[in-house]
């Protein structure tokens, strides 16, 4: 009986000790904490690679959500044949794409602003800013798609 209790306590301790970031997955990279993710690298080179990796995952996730948003728009207009709806779907899709392009330019500009001036931490400042902006946009897209 004592062994079972000790075993259960050990298992519970392991569960509680797992970092929260493990709850994230590549299919939902926005759940990763960029600081924890980047710090998996042992040196600046590895940290930069981790930053690029997370940025790539976040970009792919954002692109996927934008495609879903466009599909949602198409489904919303499906079967609407009245004259007042002619051309409206195309306008909406152009607006979605334009918003996304503008948003991407903003995220890039904000990250470049953090990078300005250089220094040893400039690259990491760029990626911190960029990844946090991507996470912000992903959360926004997820709310819209609910």
Regions found by a protein language model. Name each.
Residues 23-146:
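N-terminal alpha-helical modules
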């Amino acid at each position: 009986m004592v062994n079972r209790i000790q075993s259960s306590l050990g298992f519970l301790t392991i569960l509680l000790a797992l970092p929260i970031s493990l709850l994230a997955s590549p299919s939902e990279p926005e759940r990763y904490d960029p600081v924890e993710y980047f710090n998996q690298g042992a040196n600046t080179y590895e940290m930069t690679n981790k930053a690029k990796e997370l940025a790539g995952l976040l970009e792919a996730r954002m692109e996927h959500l934008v495609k879903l948003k466009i599909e949602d728009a198409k489904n919303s207009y499906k079967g609407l044949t009245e004259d007042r709806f002619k051309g409206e779907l195309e306008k909406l899709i152009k607006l979605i794409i334009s918003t996304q392009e503008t948003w991407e330019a903003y995220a890039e500009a904000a990250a470049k602003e953090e990078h300005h001036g250089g220094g040893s931490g400039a690259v990491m400042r760029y990626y911190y800013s960029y990844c946090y902006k991507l996470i912000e946009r992903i959360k926004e897209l997820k709310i819209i798609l609910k």
